Amino acid sequence: MTLRHHFELRETIATILADEELVIETACEGIRTARYELERYIIQDPFFNSSFEPLTITQGPDIIKNMAAAAWKAGVGPMAAVAGAIAHAGVSAAQKKGASFCIIDNGGDIAMITDRPVRVGLYAGNSPLSGKYAFFIPPKNEIYGICTSSATVGHSFSFGTADSVTVFSRDPLLADAVATAVCNVLTIADQSCLDRVDSHIDGIFAVFGEQSIIWGDIPQIIRAENRKDLITAGGLGFFPGTLI
């Protein structure tokens, strides 16, 4: 039986799916460790937390260097990769302990390993497409990222207008950063930003009201039951993206 665990630690509000309590505990510890390293680094370098521009980081914990590297490829500040980085840290910890199934939805930014097909539902705020469709994800024996940014849902800052921009990549940190970058500038009328997307991105699915944009190779889209109760949520409200 799949276990579903709600996890909160300061700004991190996540849902963890696994088959065993031990896997969930390991994933939680991975998240805590990642947050500790991040918070300790920000005390030393507050600009890392506030910059909207890419930064070159050569020293520090791996999570810091990896966030900076992903953000550099996307052309955004390093904190644009934070949710994907924390989700990745939790799944990576579980994988190192031998887990073959662990999914972490960190406020719409998902990292996973899965030995079975799963569905990831589309939540795009007030768009008529929201809650009606899902992405069918085949088994993934390596960590995979599905990250969503929105200009109309959630508390994260965005310069854009999209109801949702979902990015698929083997690198959850890069998926998170690119979702932010694309959401900031993509419109139905101007899709030129997609010409500059990093080659390590598999595909992008964006929603603007009743309209959508597909770029690259995205998973199969299937009909889905509207289950808002499965959306990762906390005191700050609902976030785009959900597990179903």
Curated annotation (Swiss-Prot):
SUPFAM superfamilies reported for this sequence: ApbE-like
HAMAP family: UPF0280
Assigned protein family: Belongs to the UPF0280 family.
Protein name, UniProt field: UPF0280 protein Mhun_0136
Originating organism: Methanospirillum hungatei JF-1 (strain ATCC 27890 / DSM 864 / NBRC 100397 / JF-1)
